[in-house]
UniProtKB/Swiss-Prot annotation:
<feature type="transmembrane region" description="Helical; Name=8">
    <location>
        <begin position="640"/>
        <end position="660"/>
    </location>
</feature>
<feature type="domain" description="MIR 1">
    <location>
        <begin position="325"/>
        <end position="389"/>
    </location>
</feature>
<feature type="transmembrane region" description="Helical; Name=6">
    <location>
        <begin position="278"/>
        <end position="298"/>
    </location>
</feature>
<feature type="transmembrane region" description="Helical; Name=4">
    <location>
        <begin position="212"/>
        <end position="232"/>
    </location>
</feature>
<dbReference type="GO" id="GO:0030447">
    <property type="term" value="P:filamentous growth"/>
</dbReference>
<feature type="glycosylation site" description="N-linked (GlcNAc...) asparagine">
    <location>
        <position position="691"/>
    </location>
</feature>
<keyword id="KW-1133">Transmembrane helix</keyword>
<dbReference type="GO" id="GO:0036178">
    <property type="term" value="P:filamentous growth of a population of unicellular organisms in response to neutral pH"/>
</dbReference>
<comment type="similarity">
    <text>Belongs to the glycosyltransferase 39 family.</text>
</comment>
<dbReference type="InterPro" id="IPR027005">
    <property type="entry name" value="GlyclTrfase_39-like"/>
</dbReference>
<keyword id="KW-0472">Membrane</keyword>
<feature type="domain" description="MIR 3">
    <location>
        <begin position="466"/>
        <end position="523"/>
    </location>
</feature>
<feature type="transmembrane region" description="Helical; Name=10">
    <location>
        <begin position="706"/>
        <end position="726"/>
    </location>
</feature>
<protein>
    <recommendedName>
        <fullName>Dolichyl-phosphate-mannose--protein mannosyltransferase 4</fullName>
        <ecNumber>2.4.1.109</ecNumber>
    </recommendedName>
</protein>
<feature type="region of interest" description="Disordered">
    <location>
        <begin position="1"/>
        <end position="23"/>
    </location>
</feature>
<feature type="compositionally biased region" description="Polar residues">
    <location>
        <begin position="13"/>
        <end position="23"/>
    </location>
</feature>
<dbReference type="GO" id="GO:0036244">
    <property type="term" value="P:cellular response to neutral pH"/>
</dbReference>
Amino acid sequence: MSQTLKKRGGNSSGRKSPTTSNIEFDDKKTEFDLNAIVPPKEPEYKYLAALTLVTLLAIYTRFTKLGTPNKVVFDEVHFGKFASYYLERTYFFDLHPPFAKLLIAFVGWLIGYDGKFKFEAIGDSYIENNVPYIAYRSLSAIQGAAIVPIMFLTMKTLGFSVAACLFSSIIVCFDNAQVTDSRLILLDATLILSVALTIFSYSKFSTFRKQSFSSKWWTWLLATGVSLSCVISTKYVGVFTYLTIGIAVIHELWILLDYRKGLTLQEFAKHFFARLWALIIVPFCIYLYWFYLHFAILTRSGPGDAFMSSEFQETLLESPLAAHSKPVQYFDQITIKHKDTGAFLHSHQHEYPLRYEDGRISSNGQQVTCVVQENAANDPNNQWEIVPTSEGANKGTKVYTNDIVRFRHVGTGGYLLTHDVASPLKPTNEEFTVVYDDVAQQRYNETLFRLRLHVPGSNPKKEKNKKEIKTLATDLRILHVDTVVAMWTHNDELLPEWAFNQQEVSGNKKIPDKDNIWNFDLITNLQSTDPRNQYVPKKVKTLPFLRKWWELQMLMFHHNNQLSSEHPFATQPGEWPLALSGVSFYNDNTEKKQIFFIGNIIGFWLEVCFLSIYIGILLADQITRRRNVHVLSDRARSRLYNTLGFLFVGWAAHYLPFFLMNRQKFLHHYLPAHLVAALFSGGLVEFICSNNSARPNGKPVGVNKYKIIAVVAACSTAIIWFFFYFRPLTYGDVYLTPEEVKARQWLDIKLHYGK
């Protein structure tokens, strides 16, 4: 021990402790300390041979049986359908940005597919419907196969040995979850490839840290930015990749800011703004471009219309809204439709119970609810007459936004009112009811409502524009003048049987809420002789691109945040690193075949072991150094904290934020973190198999080739064995007996046909 460890209190060699204060900086060099890049350790031909091997293996695992099954599998129902909508140019709405979906549609366009098949249900036949599904799946397979050699090149760029490069590549090449997701018409192959390209590009950029602003320096910095834009333009979990690179960039800039680097503030500013331009501005412009292309292609009315504002819908060809909207006039009898739930404002001659089950007291007034029903316009209980409140407003006078009106219920003759009485289901909201005759006159101010125009992105309290109101085409907030609440309904909880399980209507104090939007759907008393019945072709309107983008962006965020309900396939982040359970993607009841989405459990568990070992090494190093005992050499510590630290942060940034999210979470969300953990695992194996001693101990400096080959061979053999053992569940091409199915129900895996 005395020969290998530097003891407390003594430093007979006169060598200084390798503390931060003793680090020497080269003047005017942009040395980036986060990735302690070193040259490759072995001859180039060995890297080339190993790279060729893993590339061929990746192609084999991704392209084998690509046409099996020849039916719709899992989320192909969504992303195949979106490709068809692009090909037909019909507008649709989705939570994810357009980039990866545009790539899928581009494949269909290249081969001349018309998009007639709509991928309605899992199990629908591709063969019977003449769908070019193998071409679609080939896009994912190409991307999935490309991930593996890019990982290898990343490890090589970071200075790791051939064995370490091979091990990282094998973990992903033979991971069942990665293979499954890169063989189907899904977005994940694009996402993970973009993550891999980002880390590779940034690693390459770091190798040119001493050649600031050279062409290669700019090339790889911009390549990092473009890759980041591809990540964030595929799925919004790409923000975690931004977090990874952001932490590295902040660390790098912090080093450059040190006066010992010798940079002037002007030179530091050049570094700062170069990164701002390449990593934020350029990616954001590319991100916007995909939305521009999205809008340019989707010019026809489609299933996504209902999500968008009326103004947006009027920009689409063949929009029923543009064709059938009519100006609304006073004394028109209309139906009022809630935009979010599609329910109609309704009332009937039944009262709220005087006392609710929780003991609260109601007004015992006439119920006001919302209903979803066909031919809603034919029911007088869904019809409301718009009564003016200003002098001079007669029959035929147009209704404008910001007008103050009253609503008379056609079915019962009373007036809509809300007041300071708690609603049945939401005690913080106000109850809506209907009052009659003298009471309506006495409480006149409580029957007044302002029709406030909804403009996406604007503050509804400040929206003062007066605009002609049209059926279908004008989105409104209906604001109570007296108590300043917005009329609101919801369908997450329905009223009890005393209200026929209809939707509650209440006054919402949070006026800006996006759920407060209504429109006048249909004029029910429009006479055949009314000039408004004469069809006049309407010109398709235009909206500025940024206005359309902002509206869609806010809707995507809003609906993404609404994904908080339970899902049968949802899992918790704590289960992911150990692949405790998976998801049934497809099952064929006739041939008893199935596809089950699960990671390579051996590979996943090995990654967790290596991550845990790393944390243990860090703790041991910090504790021993507090006692002035230096076990690791300076070079080993640089490797431990810089290169491996960067990859560890990358894993944590792609994984830990999911614990803070309230939305639905699935195992496939872990795949980017799994990719980074695979890179990390190869690096840590090399670290463990190297001589990292701070003092000469007679052992060769560097990697122990025999040790690393033995470790990599043993771990890789186990990973590859598991991959082929679970292969029938990955490809869905082999029948398993019930006994064979049961034998594969590891951990919490639940498979079909085990009986």
